[in-house]
């Protein structure tokens, strides 16, 4: 399995942002701006979706699936656990305050970000 580099991961993240924005925007048109429906959809897209999708058979978000990436356990390449997903998710939110966290993937041997190292996960190109 080949490790996924910074650019592929950045493309997957960009796709996920576009997908989330489109879904939230559609919810705004459907439910009306600021409605409970929009808030629920936003919570689902910004919290639930990126937290739980790595636990599915896709092993990642739709953006990662489209680019052909999977989030797996570092040592075994198997599906990650819920605690690992939580660690990845919480640490990944640091990028909201510092986009530099993703640059570690460009400089580490296993192309890992800080949240990958903390959760003991890696991102691979899907076969």
UniProtKB/Swiss-Prot annotation:
The chain crosses the membrane at residues 12-32, 36-56, 85-105. GO terms for cellular component: plasma membrane. Keywords: Cell membrane, Membrane, Transmembrane, Transmembrane helix. Disulfide bonds: none annotated. Its main location: membrane. InterPro entries: Pra-immunoreactive (IPR051791), RDD (IPR010432). It is found in: Cell membrane. It is a multi-pass membrane protein. It comes from the Bacteria. This is Uncharacterized protein YczC.
């Amino acid at each position: 399995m080949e490790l996924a580099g910074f650019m592929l991961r950045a493309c997957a993240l960009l796709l996920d942002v576009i997908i989330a924005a489109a879904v939230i925007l559609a919810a705004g048109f459907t439910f009306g701006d600021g409605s409970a429906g929009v808030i629920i959809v936003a919570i689902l897209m910004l919290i639930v979706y990126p937290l739980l999708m790595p636990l599915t058979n896709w092993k990642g978000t739709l953006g990662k699936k489209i680019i052909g990436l999977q989030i797996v356990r570092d040592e075994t390449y198997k599906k990650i656990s819920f605690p690992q997903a939580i660690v990845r998710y919480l640490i990944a939110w640091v990028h909201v305050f510092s986009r530099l966290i993703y640059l570690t993937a460009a400089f580490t041997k296993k192309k890992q970000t800080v949240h990958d190292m903390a959760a003991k996960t890696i991102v691979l190109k899907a076969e």
